[in-house]
Amino acid sequence: MSNSEHANFPRAGFFRRLGAIIYDLLLAVAVYMIAGAIGFGIFTALSSSGLLSMNGFEHVSDLLNGTPLYKGIYQLWITLCVGLFYILFWSYGGQTLGMRAWRLKIQHPNGQSLSMITAAARLIWSLLGIGNLWILINGDKLALQDMMTRSEVVVLSKEANQMRNWHGV
């Protein structure tokens, strides 16, 4: 089944999207924790090697919490990792793992996949999921992020959900 054939599937409603959001939230927390551990490891390695001054702090965690610049860099790193989780899944297959479980796919109305830039814009416009509330008052089942990025979330058939949506896979 080509991507253009995905253009004929119905749009997803609020509760199906909410189910996928809950699944994906668990995965995003895992990505957050892994990114945090990697970032903490990098700061620990930099301070142990002497490339990063401890500025009188005894522990790296104190350094991260007590220095606004380092705390900002650390939080930016974690936020970028979680954001990339969504951007990569949305642009290279149209589905996160939570969306796959609920048979949802993000695409343009013609069935084409989102670019990484469109996926990033969609992430920003989703307002941490609050943009989905627009579906409750919009008869077209379009969320705020759908309208702003000219995309849609569709419900795939069981057969279409079994196919490999990833580019080159």
Model-predicted segments: where are they?
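Short, small/hydrophobic-residue-rich motifs at membrane-helix boundaries and re-entrant hairpins
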Residues: 1-127, 156-169
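Hydrophobic alpha-helical transmembrane segments and immediately flanking/interface helices
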Residues: 104, 137-164
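Glycine-rich flap/beta-hairpin and adjacent strands of clan AA aspartyl proteases
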Residues: 129-139
